[in-house]
């Protein structure tokens, strides 16, 4: 079985939800859900954290992740890009690719993650990256922006020559997908070309995923966990695994 290192990006300066990456979700720091998913995924053999924040680093290390260095602050601002911290990571750690596991998507099935990793290794020579996504209920062709004059305006000039395309039935448009952070696989080779994902992105489609960018979304996931439970919660509460629980 081929294995891969995981990288969890967790900067300290979240504005929407202060201290988001270590905020408690049903009693556990948010970042722990992603660490746990990696620990319980047999295709992942190492877990790294990219953070500029010492407190986040200490908590991550407590739960068994590696923080061999802190991310430079210049790569951890509101306008910093994934490419910047990924290039920095690959310059420090000698791996060919990483599974990018974003802590803002906490509810993952480790078996599903492993299946996506297996798919990557079967076709990696033909890909520049792998990216998870879920289907949108509405096409971007149904979306509006508000123009400088204060009126609604579609994002596109037309659809197949039709100007008034926003009133077409949604079935008229191709399916659209939203990247959701469940798992991405980033290749050092692609980063070295100056791109994060490249032009041959392999899609893996999940069910709908709630990402945490606001307190409201945090509450949604917390309520979901309280009502339905989750595999990771069960695994975290099981003491037969080598995972330290505070």
Regions found by a protein language model. Give the residues of each.
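N-terminal nucleotide-binding beta1-loop-alpha1 segment
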Residues: 1-18
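Hydrophobic targeting segments
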Residues: 3-8, 31, 46-49
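Conserved SAM-binding loop
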Residues: 23-24, 49, 100
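A short, N-terminal amphipathic alpha-helix
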Residues: 30-45, 62
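Short active-site oxyanion
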Residues: 43-48, 208-209
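Short phosphate-binding loop-to-helix
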Residues: 54-99, 107-118
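Conserved alpha/beta core of the MobA/IspD/sugar-nucleotide pyrophosphorylase nucleotidyltransferase superfamily
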Residues: 80, 174-246
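Conserved core of the sugar-phosphate nucleotidyltransferase
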Residues: 106-199, 204-206
